[in-house]
């Protein structure tokens, strides 16, 4: 059974950003509502209200809806028109396929001066003699009745015959009320009998008395395994009983009354509960997914079963996940570790062991707006950023250099008596080489006497000719 709650109204007010007090249109159809309540307090600005296909038995708590223009109460359990005088702007009222037998109750709609359309087809009163004439004469403001227009000549004839039609309508109402009283009594009896039958079925095999037999105790204990039926057999018998009851209920003829509608709803609820119990039994608790073993080893897991591609470059590792295109990004959680990457997609883990160690703090995750794919870029360890470009260089520490030096020395076999020139240690005496000092002044040119002139005398005071 359904009730009108604040949460129900908010869920049906998405077109108004889930704001209740300013609602102008509200649809609460097929909610199994039994009673009208709270709407006149929470939604006073309503203009259109849909309540068709529910279990409402009485029109109530709508008198404060002064702006209401259209009220749809089709396919309910209403037996009388009442409590609509306060709906001053009501222009259209739909009461199709209800159980209205008191046709004289439409007189309460005289105060609704803006009422133009009224639907009463499918009600017991619609089968009364002179039903249309009575309604047309009683409500002069009506323009349409059951989807058919009212002409002025039809209204004049109805007003002329109103004094004759009214007592006939009263008699038909009395007959209908007597029939309804009998049907209610029969429905109560059937309901009590069904309750008794259910109690008997639940206590089957027990007549209210306890028996003790000392001689039978040993034999009963010995044959205990044979007497206990397995769970599967009990489940099958219960299933057969439920199917038989279901067939019996749906094949049983019944009248179309408010009680029969309630009975069918209760039966459907019972079936629903039984199915939920069966589904809960069938559900097996799945063991938790192991992502990391006891020894700390990460495993490859693809529980969401999505496609992916892994690219291993010199500088970084790129993981491309084919995430669903229209899935919200808030449902994705990425966790990058040095040796593996884990992505939670709607609570399902995707884990992949990486071929090389990466930097989690330098990693990035981006999602495509066109395809929805998730691309995770994870730079490898040892990456150095220089001049706006990335270069992959191996960084050597002092410990690595010392190891290399030791390895080179170990390759050459050393003996006690070796040639000093081939010694691996450097010669300290030849570290600094002596420098030769050269004169800064130019050397004086030598004067060679000419062989041609024997009388030539060289004067040292005379500068040489250039």
Curated annotation (Swiss-Prot):
The keyword Ubl conjugation does not apply. Pfam families: CS_DNAAF11_C, LRR_9. Residues 185-206, 269-288, 418-466 are annotated as: Disordered. Residues 123-161 form the LRRCT domain. Gene3D superfamilies: Ribonuclease Inhibitor. Keywords: Cell projection, Cilium, Coiled coil, Cytoplasm, Leucine-rich repeat, Repeat. SUPFAM superfamilies: L domain-like. Residues 301-396 form the CS domain. One of its GO terms (biological process) is outer dynein arm assembly. It is found in: Cytoplasm; Cell projection, Cilium. Residues 178-204 form a coiled coil. Residues 185-202, 269-279 have a biased composition (Basic and acidic residues). LRR repeats lie at residues 22-43, 45-66, 67-88, 89-110. GO terms for cellular component: cilium; cytoplasm. Residues 450-460 have a biased composition (Acidic residues). It comes from the Eukaryota. May play a role in dynein arm assembly, hence essential for proper axoneme building for cilia motility. Belongs to the tilB family. Interacts (via CS domain) with ZMYND10 (via C-terminus). This is Protein tilB homolog.
């Amino acid at each position: 059974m359904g009730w009108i709650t604040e949460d129900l109204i908010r869920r049906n007010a998405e077109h108004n950003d889930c704001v209740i007090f300013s609602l102008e249109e509200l649809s609460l159809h097929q909610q199994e509502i039994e009673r009208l309540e709270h709407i006149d307090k929470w939604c006073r600005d309503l203009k259109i209200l849909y309540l068709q296909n529910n279990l409402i038995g009485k029109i109530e708590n709508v008198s404060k809806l002064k702006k209401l223009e259209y009220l749809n109460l089709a396919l309910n359990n209403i037996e009388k028109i009442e409590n609509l005088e306060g709906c001053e702007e009501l222009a259209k009222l739909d009461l199709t396929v209800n159980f209205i037998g008191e046709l004289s109750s439409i007189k309460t709609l005289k105060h609704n001066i803006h009422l133009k359309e009224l639907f009463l087809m499918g009600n017991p009163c619609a089968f009364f003699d002179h039903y249309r004439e009575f309604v047309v004469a009683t409500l002069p403001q009506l323009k349409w009745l059951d989807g058919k227009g009212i002409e002025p000549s039809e209204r004049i004839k109805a007003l002329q015959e109103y004094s004759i039609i009214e007592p006939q309508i009263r008699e038909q109402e009395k007959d209908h009320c007597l029939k309804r009283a009998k049907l209610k009594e029969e429905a109560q009896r059937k309901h009590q009998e069904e309750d008794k039958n259910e109690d008997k079925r639940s206590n089957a095999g027990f007549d209210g008395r306890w028996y003790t037999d000392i001689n039978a105790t040993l034999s009963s204990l010995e044959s205990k395994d044979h007497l206990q039926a397995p769970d599967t057999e009990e489940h099958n018998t219960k299933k057969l009983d439920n199917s038989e009851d279901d067939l019996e209920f749906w094949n049983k003829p019944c009248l179309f009354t408010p009680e029969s509608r309630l009975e069918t709803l209760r039966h459907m609820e019972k079936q629903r509960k039984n199915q939920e119990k069966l589904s809960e039994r069938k559900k097996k608790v799945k063991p938790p997914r192991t992502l990391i073993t006891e020894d700390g080893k990460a495993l490859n897991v693809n529980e969401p079963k999505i496609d992916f591609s892994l690219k291993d470059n010199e500088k970084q590792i790129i993981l491309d996940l084919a995430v669903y295109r229209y899935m919200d990004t808030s449902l994705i959680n990425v966790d990058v570790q040095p040796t593996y990457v884990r992505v939670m997609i709607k609570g399902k883990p995707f884990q992949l062991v990486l071929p090389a160690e990466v930097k989690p703090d330098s990693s990035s995750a981006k999602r495509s707006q066109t395809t929805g794919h998730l691309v995770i870029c994870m730079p490898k360890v040892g990456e150095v950023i220089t001049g706006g470009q990335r270069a992959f260089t191996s960084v050597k520490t002092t410990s690595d250099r010392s190891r290399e030096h030791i390895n080179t020395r170990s390759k050459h076999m050393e003996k006690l008596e070796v040639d000093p020139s081939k010694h691996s240690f450097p010669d300290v005496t030849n570290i600094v080489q002596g420098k030769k000092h050269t004169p800064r002044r130019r050397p004086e040119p030598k004067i060679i006497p000419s062989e041609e002139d024997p009388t030539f005398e060289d004067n040292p005071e005379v500068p040489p000719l250039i």
